[in-house]
Amino acid sequence: MVYRSRAAERIRSIANIVAALQIFFFMLLSPTFAATTGETPTTILEGGSRIDVVVENGGPFDISKPGLLDWVRWAAQAVTAYYGRFPEPHILLRIRPVGGQGIRHGVTYPWGGGLITISVGADTTPADFQSDWELTHEMVHLAFPSVAENHHWIEEGIATYVEPIARVRAHHFDPAEMWYEVVRDLPQGLPAAGDQGLDNTHTWGRTYWGGALFCLLADVEIHRETQNKKGLDDALRGILNAGGNIMVDWDLEKALRVGDQATGVPVLENLYDKMKDKPYTPDLDALWKELGIERNGTTVRFDDSAPLAATRKAITYGENTPQ
């Protein structure tokens, strides 16, 4: 989840509200937040950037928890693999130890160069860290400008779409498993009866998976119009390289225009016109067939003779696409 810097995002848990207030006041009082609280950060260097990792004091574990630092490195490597570099030169990652097992409640803030808070259960295992998607999702948020609240779908949609692809490109996720999950989950982004466009219908499914649907359709169309020379990753890198990261406020139209300039085709702007204020329901079954993706139980089978098989491979692997 990306914190709503421009329009008072409603944080849905008391724990997140308290944490946000604590972080805000500590940052007002001191430029060295970790030092103020008596916490010493552990620094990870990845993708040309510095990630300071702090485990909050008083919890059931500390920075030495098995698998924890590898988890941070893997997430940073995934984002770097997709964007070509880590989105911000220096961020702070605050880990909140909680009871139970698993990783949850990640929030990314446009503060101090980039701040991520996330909760980790005391019983979380190295295997849990290795299979996690949430920290990668939060780090992707660093790579897109803050936009108005009615465009929140693009922030969450990009993070939802890019995260599994980034993990595949970093060799941390199996491509067949990735595409199986996309085929399984993307229909949640299709408009339901009574839904409007993405700017007007703000349900969970339309925000996260509707935004991801926009990204997939854009990715396929960019590849189609450029004969697989460019993809959505080029558009998003172009936005980031033009200064469009979480620390700045941009109009969505500006971000899409910059992305289109990076690919040389007006796909993002045209698709936004199609999906922003009215429901649009693409034929996903036909799209999967064109891409050569056949669902087979709990996995998928790839058909490399399909019309857009080369596009599927380019989306999956980027510049390292097997020939």
Q: Could you say what each language-model-derived stretch is?
A:
Residues 1-17:
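N-terminal secretory signal peptides that target proteins for export/translocation
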Residues 16-31:
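Bacterial N-terminal signal peptides
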Residues 35, 245-323:
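Beta/coil-rich, acidic/histidine-enriched accessory regions frequently appended to metallopeptidases
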Residues 40-147, 151:
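Juxtacatalytic substrate-recognition/specificity segment
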Residues 67-74, 78, 130, 134, ...:
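Extracytoplasmic/secreted proteins, especially bacterial periplasmic and envelope-associated proteins
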Residues 77-84, 144, 164-171, 219-227, ...:
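Sec-exported extracytoplasmic/periplasmic mature domains
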Residues 82-94, 146-152, 170-178, 229-235, ...:
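Surface-exposed patches in mature extracellular/periplasmic domains of secreted proteins
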Residues 150-213, 219, 224-226, 232, ...:
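Acidic/His/Gly-enriched intrinsically disordered linker/tail segments
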